Regions:
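ATP-dependent phospho-/nucleotidyl transfer catalytic cores
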Residues: 1-60, 115
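A generic short alpha-helical patch detector that favors 3-5-residue windows
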Residues: 3, 87-90, 108
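Gram-positive cell-envelope targeting signals
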Residues: 20, 35, 78-80, 99
Length: 185
């Protein structure tokens, strides 16, 4: 998260120096403070939690779990596919990736998010340390960072309209996302 935060600042500084700003750059300038504050809180909170409780236990993780990597078969059987990012890590990171992708697609629907987490907790109960870790993962504005990072590392002569739309959608979903964050805190 610290590296991502440095990348956010680098992109903001680049945009600040530009005289003529595109719609995307103006959108970033208008929303940066809110998302960067969350990014700092997430990084600081996670670091403090690890200093206090130590590193969470590591397990094998999928590394990129989302709805595209789960196959449903007959009779309620499931299979997880594409383990090319598998690694040893904190298991709730897989839960975070899966849940975040689903919630982004469903406008951060609080009931859906809580049902997903409660169902997971029934099968594999989360301890207090994992819950805190999960909260800070959700707090970090990963999608915002992805958009800014894509912008910074791409050619800036032409910025896709889709990038502006994605930023606007993030801003529109912020209230619902904050409600979800309050519920899991």
């Amino acid at each position: 998260m610290e590296r991502h935060n440095r990348e956010l600042v680098r992109t903001r500084n680049y945009i600040r120096k530009k005289r003529r700003k595109s719609d995307f750059e103006r959108a970033v300038s208008g929303s940066f403070a809110i998302f960067y504050e969350q990014a700092q809180e997430a990084a600081g909170g996670l670091k403090a939690q690890i200093e206090q409780d130590g590193e969470p236990e590591n397990y094998l993780c999928h590394g990129d779990l989302n709805q595209h990597h789960i196959l449903l078969a007959e009779e309620n059987e499931m299979a997880v596919i594409e383990f090319n990012r598998m690694h040893r890590g904190v298991q709730v990171e897989d839960l975070y990736h899966f849940t975040r992708k689903i919630l982004e697609k469903h406008g951060w629907d609080l009931r859906l998010g809580m049902r997903l987490l409660e169902t997971y907790d029934r099968i594999l109960p989360l301890n207090a340390q994992e819950r805190i870790y999960l909260y800070y993962l959700f707090l970090y504005p990963e999608k915002y960072w992805k958009q800014l990072n894509f912008y910074y590392n791409a050619g800036k002569a032409w910025i896709p309209v889709r990038s502006i739309e994605k930023l606007q959608k993030l801003e529109e979903q912020q209230t619902a996302r904050n409600l979800f964050l309050e519920a899991i805190r």
